[in-house]
């Protein structure tokens, strides 16, 4: 379950930001999950709640936003949206794609008191 380590990293980022800005409590966090990140939302929510325990983010609302993946098609020279790793280009049906975005988990925003 790599969701746990991803959430640990996210909470470390949140903690650092809270310390830098003298924040005592985080009330909400927005995570952006790429379509190709291979994470389960329920596992992220469960893991996030566990790793937030005892931190400034304990009890905060977690908002998850999904980001479509984008890839460069070497056959038609276009940036295209894809939804799985072994996808074909939706424009030319070529199979030579380079994934550019959509395979990560990012802390997009933090709401504080």
UniProtKB/Swiss-Prot annotation:
Q: What happens when the gene is disrupted?
A: Deletion of the gene severely reduces hydrogenase 1 and hydrogenase 2 activity. HypA-hybF double mutant is completely blocked in maturation of hydrogenases 1, 2 and 3. However, the inclusion of high nickel concentrations in the medium can restore limited activity of all three hydrogenases.
Record annotation: effect of changing residue 90 to A:
Does not affect activity
InterPro entries given in the database record: HybF, Hydgase_Ni_incorp_HypA/HybF_CS, HypA/HybF
Enumerate the GO terms in the molecular function aspect: metallochaperone activity; nickel cation binding; zinc ion binding
The alphabetized list of GO BP terms reads: protein maturation; protein modification process
Q: Which residues make up the binding site for Zn(2+)? A: 73, 76, 89, 92
Q: What does this protein do?
A: Involved in the maturation of [NiFe] hydrogenases. Required for nickel insertion into the metal center of the hydrogenase. HybF is involved in maturation of hydrogenases 1 and 2. It may partially substitute for the function of HypA and vice versa.
**NCBIfam families given in the database record:** hypA, PRK03681.1, PRK12380.1
What is its quaternary makeup? Answer: Monomer.
Name this protein carries in UniProt? Hydrogenase maturation factor HybF
């Amino acid at each position: 379950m790599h969701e746990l380590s991803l959430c640990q990293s996210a909470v470390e980022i949140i903690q650092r930001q809270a310390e830098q800005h003298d924040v005592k409590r985080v009330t909400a966090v927005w995570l952006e999950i790429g379509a190709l990140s291979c994470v389960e939302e329920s596992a992220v929510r469960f893991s996030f709640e566990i790793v937030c325990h005892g931190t400034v983010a304990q009890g905060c609302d977690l908002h998850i936003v999904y980001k479509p993946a984008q890839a460069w098609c070497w056959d038609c020279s276009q940036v295209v949206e894809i939804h799985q790793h072994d996808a074909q280009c939706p424009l030319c049906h070529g199979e030579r794609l380079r994934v550019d975005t959509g395979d990560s988990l990012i802390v997009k925003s933090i709401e504080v008191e």
